[in-house]
A protein has these predicted regions:
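C-terminal substrate-binding subdomain of Rossmann-fold SDR/epimerase-dehydratase oxidoreductases
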Residues: 1-129
Length: 129
């Protein structure tokens, strides 16, 4: 089933970009936020020394573009059952990665087409199909 007729947008992020971000962040020791309080605190910081960062491509892609990239990489057309949007679903989501970029100067860049192609090649090689 393809909901909202494939018109929803999602932030697809290639695994190598995620690994690169984690590697860059691992050596940055977070500092406690002395101004943090339960009442006014952000879930990304606290009085304990930790930080939470979004790792994403920050470039939402229509679901149909993702499906098309998969079809091209596999060399076959998917059987698609187009459906209306489901109650409670959202049309567009993406990650705010500015804090990550500000910290380590990294923003994921791998396109959906390139990432899907790389994944399909890896999958076929790994499973010898």
């Amino acid at each position: 089933d393809v909901y909202n007729y494939g018109k929803m947008k999602r932030d697809f992020t290639y695994i190598d970009d995620i690994v690169e971000a984690v590697v860059r962040v691992q050596d940055v020791i977070p500092q406690a936020n002395a101004d943090w309080t339960v009442e006014s605190g952000s879930p990304a910081t606290s009085s304990a020394p930790y930080r939470v960062y979004n790792i994403g491509n920050s470039s939402p892609v229509e679901l149909m573009d993702y499906i098309t990239a998969l079809e091209e990489a596999l060399g076959m057309e998917a059987k698609k059952n187009m459906m209306p949007i489901q109650p409670g679903d959202v049309l567009d989501t993406s990650a705010d990665t500015q804090p990550l970029y500000d910290l380590v100067g990294f923003k994921p860049q791998t396109s959906v087409k390139e990432g899907v192609k790389n994944f399909v090649e890896w999958y076929k090689d790994y499973y010898q199909i």
